Curated annotation (Swiss-Prot):
SMART domains linked to this entry: GatB_Yqey (SM00845)
Location of this chain's protein in the cell: Mitochondrion
Quaternary structure, from the entry: Subunit of the heterotrimeric GatFAB amidotransferase (AdT) complex, composed of A, B and F subunits.
Entry protein name: Glutamyl-tRNA(Gln) amidotransferase subunit B, mitochondrial
GO biological process, one term: mitochondrial translation
UniProt gene name: PET112
Originating species: Lachancea thermotolerans (strain ATCC 56472 / CBS 6340 / NRRL Y-8284) (Yeast)
Length: 547
C-alpha cells in the first residue's frame, strides 16, 4: 500500500498544482465558505530556568557550536546508575503559566516514560506527563481591539499543560557523511501546551502564537523565540470534519501559516475531486518542506510509545495555598497593562502601548520591559504634577518612545545607566521646558542627545543641571528679536535659493506651501530658537506677499 500511495499522491499533486497554481501558499489565499477549516496547536516551550529539568547542569541549549555537549551531566547523557531529581524552579514556572492561562493546576501530577529510540535521545525514552498532566483546561482570550482578529473576541480553549524534557540535537554533516549529537539541549525543561481545535482562520492562529509568546516573555519564563527553537509549534488541521492531519517542521510563524494554507488547499482539492474518502479517511503526520507538505507517517505506522509511570520520580504535590501564593505574586498580564495604558490619563495608541508593555527580544541588553514601563510611568507622574491642567499626554509618550529609545539604541546606552543621571523627574522638567516654550523641540532633542552622550562617555552618576546646560549652549527660545536682524536672516535665506520659480510661486500665491520651506530653513539656521510665526511674518514682508 505504501508503494502505490506515494506515486498516486504525487500524480494528484501535479494535477492539483495545475488547477490551483494561482492559489500559492503566499498569494491569493482565501478560506472558502463551503470548506470549513478547523485547527488546534501543540506548542513546546523551553523554560529559562537556571538548571535543567532533572539535573544540575546549566540550562543553556544554545551554547556555542564550539562547545557541544558542554552543559551536560551524567543523567543528561544517560550514564548507568544516574537518577533524575526534579528542579523546583520548573514547577514554579509551570504554575505561573497555568495561572496566567486560567488552567486548573493538578495538585498531584505524575511523570511517565515515553519510549522510542533515536540518536539524540540517549535514554531510549522521554520523561513526560501522559496520564496525569500538570494542569488541565484554561483558555487564552483573543480580542479584536488588541490582537487584530475579525471577531470582537475569540476564546481559545486549552486541553492541558504538561512538563517534559527536551531531546538532544542531531547535527547533520552531509559533506562528512555522518551525523553528530549535541546533548546541550538534552533534559532542558519544556512545557507542552495543547489547545482545543478552536481556530477557524489564519488571523486567529497568528494572534494566538504572538500572544502566547508575549505572555511567556512577560512572565519571564521563556524567550519564546521560534527561530532558535525555544518555542516549537505543531499544527493539527482538518477540513469539513475529515481526519486530522498533523503538520511538523514549522520553524517560524511564516512557515506555520504557509503550511496551513498549502494543506488547506490540498485537502480542499481532494474533497472537490471526490478523493477525500481515499486520502483523508485516516490521520497522518506531514512535514513542511518550505513549499509543500509531505507525508511522514500515517495512522497505520503510528509509533507505540508504551507509556508507563516513571518509577524513579515521585509525584509533583502542590498545595492550594502554593497556587494561591503564586497567583497573588503575579504581575499584571499584558492585556491588563495595555488596557491601562490606552485609558485615561495616558491615552496611548495601541502601537505605542505595545512598545512599552510587550517584551521584544531586540533590546534586552539596553532595558527590560519592566524597567522601560516603570520609567515611562514615573516620568508621566512627575510631568503630570508639574503640568497640572496643561497636561498633554502625548508629550511624554512621544519623547520616551521616539527620542529616548532612539538615542539609547544609537548610543547603545542601557536605560538603567541613563536613569541614574537623568531620572524621570529630570525628564519631566525637560518636557515642561519644551511645553512652556522655554526651549524649542529642536533644542530639546539636541539637549537630550548631549545629556545621554555625556552619560555614556563619562558615566555621570549625578542628576544633570538643565538650566546650566541651556544657559551654556544658549538654547533659550528668542521670543523677541530685532526686526532688522530677523530681516537680515530672511534675506540671506532667500538669496541662497537657486530656483527663482520657487520665490515667484510664493509671491503669486500659486505655491503657498513653499513658504513653509523657507520657514523651515529659518528654523534650521536659528536652531529652533526663533518661533515659526515670526519667520512667516518676516518672509511675507520681505517678499511683499499679499495673500
Amino acid at each position: 500500500m505504501g508503494c502505490t500511495f506515494l506515486p498516486l499522491e504525487s500524480a494528484f499533486m501535479l494535477q492539483f498544482t495545475r488547477c490551483f497554481g494561482s492559489r500559492t501558499a503566499n498569494k491569493g489565499f482565501q478560506l472558502l465558505p463551503d470548506f470549513k477549516l478547523k485547527c488546534g496547536l501543540e506548542i513546546h516551550t523551553q523554560l529559562s530556568t537556571q538548571n535543567k529539568l532533572f539535573s544540575l547542569s546549566t540550562n543553556d541549549p544554545f551554547a556555542s557550536a564550539n562547545l557541544p555537549n558542554h552543559h551536560t551531566s551524567f543523567f543528561d547523557v544517560s550514564l548507568p546508575g544516574s537518577q533524575p531529581k526534579l528542579n523546583p524552579e520548573v514547577v514554579l514556572f509551570a504554575t505561573k503559566l497555568a495561572v496566567a492561562l486560567n488552567s486548573k493546576v493538578n495538585l498531584n501530577s505524575h511523570f511517565d516514560r515515553k519510549h522510542y529510540f533515536y540518536a539524540d535521545q540517549p535514554m531510549g525514552y522521554q520523561i513526560t506527563q501522559h496520564y496525569s498532566p500538570f494542569a488541565k483546561g484554561g483558555f487564552l482570550e483573543l480580542l479584536g481591539s488588541l490582537d487584530s482578529i475579525d471577531e470582537n473576541s475569540k476564546r481559545i480553549q486549552l486541553v492541558q499543560l504538561q512538563i517534559e524534557q527536551d531531546t538532544g540535537k542531531s547535527v547533520y554533516r552531509g559533506s562528512e557523511g555522518r551525523s553528530l549529537i549535541d546533548l546541550n539541549r538534552s533534559n532542558v525543561p519544556l512545557i507542552e501546551l495543547v489547545t482545543q481545535p478552536n481556530f477557524t482562520d489564519l488571523k486567529q492562529i497568528r494572534a494566538f502564537i504572538k500572544k502566547f509568546q508575549n505572555l511567556v516573555r512577560h512572565l519571564g519564563i521563556s524567550t519564546g523565540d521560534l527561530e532558535t527553537g525555544a518555542m516549537r509549534v505543531d499544527v493539527n488541521l482538518s477540513v469539513n470534519g475529515y481526519s486530522r492531519v498533523e503538520l511538523k517542521n514549522l520553524p517560524n510563524t511564516s512557515s506555520i501559516l504557509s503550511a496551513i494554507k498549502y494543506e488547506y488547499q490540498r485537502q480542499v482539492g481532494l474533497i472537490q475531486s471526490g478523493e477525500a474518502d481515499k486520502y483523508l479517511s485516516s490521520s497522518e503526520t506531514r512535514g513542511w518542506t518550505g513549499s509543500s507538505t509531505v507525508k511522514l507517517r500515517s495512522k497505520e505506522t503510528t509509533i507505540d510509545y508504551r507509556y508507563m509511570p516513571d518509577p524513579e520520580l515521585p509525584s509533583i504535590k502542590i498545595s492550594p495555598g502554593t497556587v494561591q501564593s503564586v497567583s497573588q505574586s503575579m504581575p499584571k498580564l499584558p492585556d491588563a497593562v495595555l488596557h491601562d495604558l490606552m485609558s485615561e490619563p495616558y491615552g496611548l495608541a495601541l502601537k505605542d502601548a505595545k512598545i512599552l508593555a510587550i517584551k521584544g527580544n531586540g533590546h534586552d541588553q539596553l532595558y527590560t520591559q519592566t524597567s522601560l514601563l516603570k520609567y515611562y510611568l514615573d516620568t508621566f507622574s512627575c510631568y503630570s504634577t508639574l503640568a497640572g491642567q496643561q497636561l498633554n499626554p502625548r508629550l511624554p509618550t512621544n519623547w520616551i518612545i521616539h527620542e529616548l529609545l532612539g538615542n539609547l539604541n544609537r548610543l547603545q546606552l542601557p536605560l538603567e545607566k541613563a536613569a541614574e543621571a537623568f531620572p524621570p523627574k529630570k525628564f519631566a522638567e525637560l518636557l515642561m521646558l519644551i511645553q512652556d516654550d522655554k526651549i524649542s523641540k529642536a533644542s530639546g532633542k539636541l539637549l537630550l542627545f548631549h545629556i545621554l552622550n555625556e552619560i555614556n562617555k563619562l558615566s555621570l552618576a549625578q542628576p544633570v543641571d538643565l538650566s546650566a546646560l541651556i544657559e551654556g549652549f544658549d538654547l533659550n527660545v528668542i521670543k523677541k528679536i530685532d526686526a532688522n536682524e530677523l530681516r537680515e536672516i530672511c534675506t540671506e535665506i532667500v538669496g541662497g535659493i537657486s530656483d527663482p520659480k520657487l520665490i515667484e510661486g510664493i509671491v503669486s500665491g500659486k505655491k503657498k506651501n513653499s513658504l513653509k520651506f523657507l520657514i523651515g530653513q529659518g528654523m534650521r539656521v536659528s536652531q529652533g530658537r526663533i518661533k515659526p510665526h515670526l519667520f512667516e511674518q518676516a518672509f511675507k514682508e520681505l517678499l511683499k506677499v499679499k495673500w
